[in-house]
Amino acid sequence: MDTIKETDSFSKYQIGEAVGKGAFGKVFKALNAETGDFCAIKQIEKTIISEKQLPSIIQEIKLLQTLQHPNIVKFIESYETSRYLYFALEFIEGGSLAKIAKRYGCFQEPLLSRYFSQVLKGLAYLHEKGVIHRDIKSDNILITKEGVIKLADFGSCTYSAIDRKLTVVGTPFWMAPEVIQMDMNARSTACDIWSLGCTLLEMLTGNPPYWDLGTMPAMFAMVNNPHPPIPNNISADLKHFLLACFVRDINKRPTASQLLEHPWIKQHIHEPSQSQPASSPEPSRIKSSGSGSKLSINTYAEGYDVESDDDTTNSNNGSDHDRIQQLESQKKEMTETIKRLKLHFLRAMKEKKVMKDMISQLVTERDEYMIKLGLTPPPLPPILANATLNSKSSLDSSNELLNKESSQGNLLGSGGSGSPYTNHTRSSSAPLTAPGKIISTHQIHSPSLSNSSASASTSGVSNNKERGSSILTNDFFHPPSDDDQHSPTNDLFLHEHFEKNLKVTASSSPSSLSKNSRLTTKFELESDNNTNNNNNNNNNNNNINITTTTTTTTTTPASNQNLGAYYQSSGNLHLYTNQNNLTNNNINNTNNNNNNNNNNNNNNNLGSNTNVDMYLRTSSEKTHLSITQPVSLSGALSYGDHLNPSVTIGGHNSLKQKGSGKTSIPVLQKEPSNKSLNSLNNNNVNNNNNNNNNNNNNNNNNNNNNNNNNNNNNTNSNSNNNTNNINSTNNINTNNINNVLGTSPSRKISNSDQFTPNRKSSQPIAPSFSLLNQSLDRNPNSNNNNNNNNNNSNNNNNNNNNNNNNLNSGSNSFNNNSPISSFTNNNNNNESGDEYDDDSDIIEDEQSSNSSLSFNNSNVPQVESVVVNVQPPRVGDECKVKCGDGWYDAVVDLVSGSTFVVTIKPFKIKREVSHSDVTLAPLQFPVTATKKKKFSLFNRK
């Protein structure tokens, strides 16, 4: 050891042999050369103490010098060198209880009661001074020759007024659970009580609890078991004493002063009187007073009943008084606990409401975005679907209560020695409880969501459930109704034939038509008051008055029971009639004398020429041309000289007026979009030119030869300009991609074709035909060979013949331009079945050719596999898809869950693909060995 200088005060001690060794160093027996008394010198290495901790420890040791108690080893003085700390302590000759137990065996209960009563007195003194021993065990309990117990080994002692102490705070087998768990709030005098119980078990059994398990398992068992195992061969009082020491709640664990009043301690303290035999001493009852009553001990251990002294009235009165005080204390504690629980519950309610509002806002934004993308939003989360939001009044009251309780700031008691929840002294370095008041440190400001927003989200989700389950249906890819801030309430369809005499009146100028405006068009059938009606089959030469008005609000179709229509900006013009009108097959209306004048006035009201983009939809994927189901048509409805190239025609969703020009028959032109004719499965539209020309003869009751000539001339003009001989095609072939009936291969695309943009939906394309020159028969097995010549009252046979000749002339010129045979019903599902040779390509207009390359979804094979560059695929990524035997370019349009949608570029169709079919090929795509065959729009002769 270091040499102590002679000039130092510690040089008076002469160091002798070592009498012990601890975790911090050795203990030597020393002689005080000045007094001749023996003392113990404890040597501690400074290397185990950090420089920051050293000053506080020195101060703590000096404070320990002030401790003076008969059951505590006297601390004499300390000394410091460069390597060690020296403590001069009172020397105890008897040694420790561990050595005595090892030498003489286990102790009996009476002797243990005497010894531990002195230990409790020493602990009570230390705890009153604020000192926590932290290492109570048999090795640190010394005994003199007279049998006096002394608490020693303050190497791990801490003074509770200093923040940090020595690193070693006990031995694992004697440590309390809160110390093992390193609970900073548990650094109190209660840990010495737990260690005292473990030391008592050591004296009874010879080993501390869980000694046979080892260090780590013993610590685990100490934390998880309710209490250490208690021997069965002990008295009930001792068992009760041990259970009181092993109470896990530090607030309910008794103090050393309270344990001194335990019956097991008291019954062995007294000295037996001479009159009483020593064999059967009866313990004397010591009256309890203050906090150390025997009643308070009973509250710490279950199942133990202390016998009451029925002969002592004062003792009973004292017990009742203590019991009343205890009950009042428990009542007060329960009241405070309930108040704290209520506060936390209200705070949790408020935070839950804020969380629901944030989730509701996120769900609403997600649903709106998915609807715009055409996706079906998922159902609401359970927190919004099942739970109901609290009312505003309850939330306001909870906020008021929170503010009130926060302002009081006394709901949670401080962790000092004056805390009403425990009698143990805590270390000031770590508070036992939370701060004294609960104050909201920050206010969460989230965007407020009203109940209407949440309900809007719910309704939005419910409305989207009406969509089809498959994301590849036509309704799914159709433009959503809210794109233009309005949507029609229902879709009705045109069930009658299109052979109508149209009278259109536009009440608003084109400049007044905006994106958010809607045109409500009413179709009315003029009744015929004349009696000169011939029995013509399916001759619907009706006069239709069309009145167009502009409104900025959502309107419903006209209430007319015969025929109606409405205009939608995102989906062109919708025409429809009721099903009841289908039975009126024979409507033979004749015109009055002023038929020509009416037609002229009609054209004047339209501003000479008016173009209306229009289409009709069906609710099913396939269109069957039957009399009971509507047909889906699409195109541009043109009034007047719409084929004049010098006139600029309004594009998609427009109802615009052009310059003045001569009036002509309205013609529905083909829309130039890559749409497929949606399953018009081999339905024949048999149109005979001669019969249709006869149908277009508007006969007058009086002498109307000139009127008929004008009418037929207009028809011929439209026939020549509008692809000539519109009715020359007999059958529609769904697999031959061309959807135009009788279209000349060398024709130029009309103005309506050029300015009508593509729609997003996969709607079927209607064939081009004249509303007056074409009668659409919905029966595929019937021919339109009807002699619908309405004879005039003055026998205008010559005029009719001239009209027919004019029409036939148009048909002949059509045949001269391109000798095209009528379409056949050869359904070929192979996409490469139709071929054409480059030398025989008769299509002159490239735009017309490209615009008609549309495919039916049923003709393209299903996607078997997909090759992408990035996994998982993202929207806009290029990829390759395998359909049948070929690979095609595609692009990813939508990604949703386990599937995503790709658009196959050559076919302009969409396919839904599972992620399981995707193959990652970052370097190259599959290459097909065979050249992809081309499609022919027309069959070669």
From Swiss-Prot:
Extract the ranges annotated as region (Disordered): 270-294, 394-490, 526-560, 579-611, 648-857
Q: Could you give a GO molecular-function term held by this entry?
A: protein serine/threonine kinase activity
Query: Which range is the signal sequence, renumbered to this chain?
Result: none
List the cofactors: Mg(2+)
Where are the active-site residues found?
135 (proton acceptor)
Compositional bias (Polar residues) at which positions? 394-405, 420-431, 654-663, 740-778
Q: What is its EC number?
A: 2.7.11.1
| Pfam families attached to this UniProt entry | Pkinase
- Give the similarity note: Belongs to the protein kinase superfamily. STE Ser/Thr protein kinase family.
What name has this protein been given in UniProt? Serine/threonine-protein kinase DDB_G0283821
Species for this entry = Dictyostelium discoideum
